[in-house]
């Protein structure tokens, strides 16, 4: 345990709460002391939704420490069951309350006897895994719970849909441009006449999870969230998964070809549509020329963030734009092997760390023309006078835009080109107020 000024990923209970609050009509009970209960405020501020965050804190106070938590936790579960009438209540401790070593599974079993909702204890180790790993684990646990429950009651849907269909897995609350990406992916599916069978966890109910086996294919745009679920569905039902982030021309084209091949939809007409769409995007090449023409030497970039976004963007900037990637890195240590394999041929140096001071020191030493990173790299860039485009969580409210800004699909290519053009070209333009300072 160490005191941290900045964390790229939060503690495990944040991951569990992200998944629980993504589902419709699911409520989370957080067994925690005051101070660990910042999730509600953070999510309300960033997501700006109409509804309240469905998370209640069962506060660990001096009375709980004296008498034990059982009565209070069970009372809170039953109270929320009566008030909110959810389909599922998820109980999670935090790393702090886990120190008490209480039998929370016993609390859940007792509460289930009098609760109309299903009650589930989040099965995560709060000392060994981080927010992203807890997201993945909690989603798999909820899917497994409802698959097994409905299999026992013989209500599980196993017959495939007549038309090609997919499950979209990994869209969650507080994800990087997740809601916009979902809309763009839905447009892609509609364009190629593919049915969206189920999108989870964001915006779906646990009752619809019985329909997961009906799909022909699982789509996982974000590698960090959904791999465990896809492995479980593959093991139980033989459902294959496509794990590609369709960001940029090359990856989008690769995604579409693999998607249509997997669904046996490839034909001359569809291939022609893909090529026409791709040609329109290639007309944006003038932005590439504008972005790199100001100096004769190649522009140098540093990229840091989540493994999936950084790996995809590194290839995009190197192959499609022609930037020299002098360093790329990730804070996802659990994905270090996969990440290194993906980027080793596209950058000069790889950095895998959760320490923001290491990336700050590298940026200061290497002096890139542009940075692409998280909110922390934005701060570092501002301090050093280097422009930064934000391409990955963790992020602040600027990167939860109300306007439509997907990072994937056809519109996502335009978003990335805007980000690239503004980051590279506008850094040397003087602000009007600075220019006319004496007059103003």
Curated annotation (Swiss-Prot):
The keyword DNA repair does not apply. Protochlorophyllide reductase is composed of three subunits; ChlL, ChlN and ChlB. Forms a heterotetramer of two ChlB and two ChlN subunits. Substrate binds at residues 427-428. It catalyses: chlorophyllide a + oxidized 2[4Fe-4S]-[ferredoxin] + 2 ADP + 2 phosphate = protochlorophyllide a + reduced 2[4Fe-4S]-[ferredoxin] + 2 ATP + 2 H2O. This is Light-independent protochlorophyllide reductase subunit B. HAMAP family: ChlB_BchB. GO terms for cellular component: cyanelle. Keywords: 4Fe-4S, ATP-binding, Chlorophyll biosynthesis, Cyanelle, Iron, Iron-sulfur, Metal-binding, Nucleotide-binding, Oxidoreductase, Photosynthesis, Plastid. [4Fe-4S] cluster binds at residue 36.
